[in-house]
Swiss-Prot record:
Its main location: membrane. The gene is PCDHGA2. This is Protocadherin gamma-A2. Residues 1-28 form the signal peptide. It comes from the Eukaryota. Residues 29-692 are extracellular.
Amino acid sequence: MAALQKLPHCRKLVLLCFLLATLWEARAGQIRYSVREEIDRGSFVGNIAKDLGLEPLALAEQGVRIVSRGRSQLFALNPRSGSLVTANRIDREELCAQSAPCLLNFNILLEDKLTIYSVEVEITDINDNAPRFGVEELELKISETTTPGFRIPLKNAHDADVGENALQKYALNPNDHFSLDVRRGADGNKYPELVLERSLDREEEAVHHLVLVASDGGDPVLSGTSRICVKVLDANDNAPVFTQPEYRISIPENTLVGTRILTVTATDADEGYYAQVVYFLEKSPGETSEVFELKSTSGELTIIKDLDYEDATFHEIDIEAQDGPGLLTRAKVIVTVLDVNDNAPEFYMTSATSSVSEDSLPGTIIGLFNVHDRDSGQNAFTTCSLPEDLPFKLEKSVDNYYRLVTTRALDREQFSFYNITLTAKDGGNPSLSTDAHILLQVADINDNAPAFSRTSYSTYIPENNPRGASVFSVTAHDPDSNDNAHVTYSFAEDTVQGAPLSSYISINSDTGVLYALRSFDYEQLRDLQVWVIARDSGNPPLSSNVSLSLFVLDQNDNAPEILYPAFPTDGSTGVELAPRSAEPGYLVTKVVAVDRDSGQNAWLSYHLLKASEPGLFSVGLHTGEVRTARALLDRDALKQSLVVAIQDHGQPPLSATVTLTVAVADRIPDILADLGSLEPSAIPNDSDLTLYLVVAVAAVSCVFLAFVIVLLAHRLRRWHKSRLLQASGGSLTGMQSSHFVGVDGVRAFLQTYSHEVSLTADSRKSHLIFPQPNYADTLISQESCEKKDFLSAPQSLLEEEREETFSQQAPPNTDWRFSQAQRPGTSGSQNGDDTGTWPNNQFDTEMLQAMILASASEAADGSSTLGGGAGTMGLSARYGPQFTLQHVPDYRQNVYIPGSNATLTNAAGKRDGKAPAGGNGNKKKSGKKEKK
């Protein structure tokens, strides 16, 4: 009763132990199953999902698969149920031969986590193989003299099954002479022997037919048979005998072919023919006869094929010795193959990637692989390594699995790919190794902005360049690849002189070549400051910029411009004054020119091209000063014409010319007296023009006559008052004067008081001259006279009026003349002679002020011929020579006031009623004009 109570407790204890063992195996990462051989394909083996503690759906999502090496896939995973099933036919005998138990090992890989689980499946045997003999019929020869008890070894049967399904017993059919005895060998196998129970008599029965049956222990029992034919021989009653029934040797697997490994010997007690022994290898179904060879006469056992420990660890060889008549004996040779390190480790790549991003974090898994060595023992112990200078390391997992992971951040710009060499080495002596190569590409990210080769650029463009010409190119390099390295170029938005930069230059977005969109002019634009932007095509794009300075180079495209003497607007030509008393080197005038170019293109030189009197004047090469080269002579003409050329130093040089008219005279009256000689002798006769002018002048004359009468009345009234007051004239010091004074300037003052009557040289017609308003401060030459408007009038009227005018005009004051300081030249360069006189009454002062203010107003409103202000010769302060008026010239002796018998002269002359001293010369000239 107590025993019955303890029974449940024992069961619980056994169950607990089994559970603990299962948990231990699971903890150790080992899953074990058992399955019979030859079961149908798709048969259930075990529930992997349950044993791993995962749901079937999670198992499928994590990517589970079976990893095995070196054999066909025998098992498969059902992704829906998570169960392990058979995938192919399983033959235990093919997989494990006689080994027991038959264990198959493989691994389960979870690809999501790269986790390995070991699975072991035991293949259980079924009785699917019957015992088989090597030969179906065996012939034995026994001498009739053989005594009872003689044993004859028989060929044993082979059963591929193991355990109870293996060979269990032998049986011999009943007979009177033979019995069967079964012995167990050292290898555990059963070997049948035929035992002679009774003496044979050949004459009674020459041949005995026996049947040997081999049976296994399966259910049902399977068996195999072999027929034995025993022939009874005469007289030879001794069979050969081996020196030992079983031979054992051990040889390394690298033993060379042809090597003798053993010599067997059998002896026969008979003599002569009955004692001649020959040796044979017993035919067997294995590969023994293909690996070894036994020489029939010597008994030498040699190798005829390479041994391989990995294919077979030992070989069992059956040998026979037979004498002449046919008596034989058998023995066994057990050859043990010793392992040598003849197999290098092998790589089995389970999972590997060919590309990794350069921004991957350290610890990123690159690949998973297994290392296996087919050798055994220390020869199969493997280690795996890789070069130390690579940013990778190996992490060992179970069952010689390794993970290749990164150790630091990667940079594609330093290394775009890695050729990783994995080295597996075994523990043999000498050690063998195997290399595996993994080509890993580093995928690019846009982590580098384009970079210019220089921090700034500068280039030079000649002006007047053709539109669309290439002027420069910039290049930026991006160390990234593909789109991340594709650089496009553009300009930063900017304006130049109020216009967008894009209207001046453009840039090819792909090549970085800059093109000029317009022809540059150095005088308008001398440089451009541009910011060039280089942008890659990454996401997001990166950019950088660089400054580019474009300098416009000057070309000699501007001829010199003459500032002085300027071309007058009324067609007149300026006349320079040179006194006859001028010494050599006297400064007559100065030609001033500028060139809008720069540098050597603006460097000017002056040359005298032509002169009416060669050798009289010279021109400064770099100053443009016109000076007398010798003293003036009486024979020198009054009018001297000079052609001055101004040339720059460009390539090719450009030039300009100016014509100067120099009047050689000491005083203004001399010039006025000889003015007729400077006028043209003929004026083209244009009848149509004369008709229009007559009508126009007649209308203007009426208006002008009324204006003159009113103005004269007003002036006489003011003059009368000034006589009563007898106010002394104030000095006008500090007042600037123009460079030179011409007849037009005087007429601008005189035209409000009178009109002039003259005769033309080519006709007897009379002309009434109404002077046009003259805005120039220069003397009038012949060219200016051609633009006067003439109106015909009766000859008698003109002569009468002229006689009245000349009879009432007082001789001019000849005391006034230009001093050396008043002539063109540097301000204050020469001392004046102080021979001029100053106005000394109110009327004289007012007249002089009116004349100066008229000239100043003309210069101020820009109508002057030279375009300058009063007293500046029409030049700016930069270019023009600085002249100051040392003495104001007295024009009073040349001014006639209608209705008065006096002329505007100094106070002394007015009181005395005489001409001033030195006026005789001028009086004679006036007399000549009256005669004409």
